[in-house]
Amino acid sequence: MSLFQTPTRRQIDAALAVLRVVLGVTFILHGGQKLFIYGLDGVTGSFAQMGIPGAAFVGPLVAFVEFFGGIAIVLGLLTRLAALGVGATMVGAILAVHLEQGFFNPGGVEFPLALLASAVALVLTGAGGYSADAVIAKRIGVPEASGRPETVRERARRAV
């Protein structure tokens, strides 16, 4: 593989699988910590103490989105939706908690920003070929993206 060579579909799929597993496991652990260690009452109290509005609703919601969204991301199941959900939790965390800590300081935006960027990448790309999404798409006959817009002629041929 050359430094300047365009990656193959397999390489892209492998890279997306690595990204999904690392991001998903990270969210499973963070959501699991909220659900099973702190508990929903602890999460609600912590969110209220940080001044997050609607802590009784938002705290448990974040815990569930992180935990179950992480599982979905690892499996590559409804990946774009799951990544959108965990990405939204990171936007909230950055704005409500981490931004005032700066970038490098403990509790700063560095880590949640990296998680947000990873989630956005999955929203944009989808899960890749090594995923439940790919299996489902193949079974229901969703055509693979070609990297270019479909022409009117191609669309007409497919419709017949």
Regions found by a protein language model. Give the residues of each.
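Membrane-interface interhelical connector segments
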Residues: 36-54
